[in-house]
């Protein structure tokens, strides 16, 4: 009777040893980047599981050349620079396949993206990593590129009704809900709160607002949510909006800065002498926030983990292009909440230039 047991592969070895697929691949093929002890463990486990290399598949993969473009905004750099770094890190760790990675930039969400796509797609890429701003404007772009044979991977947000092959982002609804709960715990008396957003036609930004509003209504009915302010990721617009809001009659006592475009708002508060008089929850982590969190001027920041988002988006896209995983990945990372008490666990990861507010 024939035995139909599945032959062990690299993934099985990696799972058994709790190491990465890349580590196993390097150890099996005697490539640099793996210490001798790990290499020995990999070879022992390969022998134990009865691993046999698939020569035909290996030959096809080694001869495969994949071209990928990352088309992303330049601003807000506190988010997009580490996102690009995550993509670059994953590309450098790719083994067994030739990957050509190009970066294309445009100024900010909903400004210059169509031109950037037109320029990038004059070259035919196997895959594109991108952040969909206005979902309605992006749907025809995604459809056109998909029909041309390009696999489209969303990162940082999503366009769920499009032909994209998958998406990687932080759970936006939960991020907004956490921010509302934090303010609700701090603000026990009747007061106004406000949300600074970027572009509500972007799913990520809209979901944060929904999560914030629904949680606030449930947990803090004594807090009134003022109309949302959209800066369209323009620092000057956010600064002017903050000045006008905080000098108005219905001045809020709590703020949720739901994108990384927080510096201009914080600067406006500092100039008005209100930075220590308002409860603030920000988004992401960059040098300018660190002293404010340390001094208690910011309650907490919701870290969207952009490096991890970029890394996973690249890895999932490559796996799809190589035929290793044809499932459409829908990955929502748990946001990390950074307080003064756990700031030291995250501050070493910050690499952006210092841009002090105070």
Model-derived regions, located:
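Hydrophobic alpha-helical
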Residues: 128, 132-146, 212, 227-289
């Amino acid at each position: 009777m024939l035995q139909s047991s599945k032959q062990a592969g690299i993934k099985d070895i990696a799972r058994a040893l709790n190491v990465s697929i890349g580590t196993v691949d390097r150890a099996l093929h005697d490539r640099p980047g793996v210490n001798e002890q790990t290499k020995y463990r990999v070879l022992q486990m390969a022998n134990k599981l009865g691993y046999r290399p698939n020569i035909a598949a290996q030959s096809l993969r080694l001869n495969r050349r994949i071209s990928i473009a990352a088309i992303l905004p330049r601003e807000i750099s506190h988010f997009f620079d580490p996102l690009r770094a995550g993509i670059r890190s994953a590309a450098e760790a790719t083994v067994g396949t030739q990957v050509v990675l190009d970066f294309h930039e445009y100024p900010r969400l909903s400004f210059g993206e169509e031109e950037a796509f037109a320029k990038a797609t004059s070259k035919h890429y196997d895959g594109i990593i991108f952040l969909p701003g206005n979902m309605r404007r992006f749907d025809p772009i995604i459809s056109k590129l998909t029909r041309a044979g390009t696999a489209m991977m969303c990162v940082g947000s999503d366009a769920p009704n499009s032909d994209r092959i998958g998406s990687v982002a932080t759970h936006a609804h939960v991020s907004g809900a956490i921010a509302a709960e934090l303010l609700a715990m701090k603000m026990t008396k009747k007061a106004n709160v406000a949300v600074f957003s970027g572009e509500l036609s972007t799913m990520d930004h809209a979901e944060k607002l929904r999560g914030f509003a629904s949680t606030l209504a449930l947990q803090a009915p004594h807090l009134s949510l003022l109309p949302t302010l959209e800066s369209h990721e323009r620092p000057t617009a956010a600064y002017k909006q903050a000045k006008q809001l905080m000098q108005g009659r219905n001045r809020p006592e709590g703020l949720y800065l739901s994108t990384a475009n927080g510096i201009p708002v914080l600067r406006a508060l500092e100039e008005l002498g209100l930075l220590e008089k308002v409860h603030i929850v920000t988004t992401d982590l960059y040098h300018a926030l660190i002293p404010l969190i340390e001094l208690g001027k910011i309650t907490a920041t919701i870290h969207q983990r952009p490096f991890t988002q970029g890394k996973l988006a690249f890895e999932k896209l490559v796996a799809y292009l190589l035929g290793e995983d044809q499932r459409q990945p829908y990955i929502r990372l748990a946001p990390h909440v950074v307080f003064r008490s756990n700031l030291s666990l995250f501050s070493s990861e910050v690499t952006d230039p210092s841009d002090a507010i105070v």
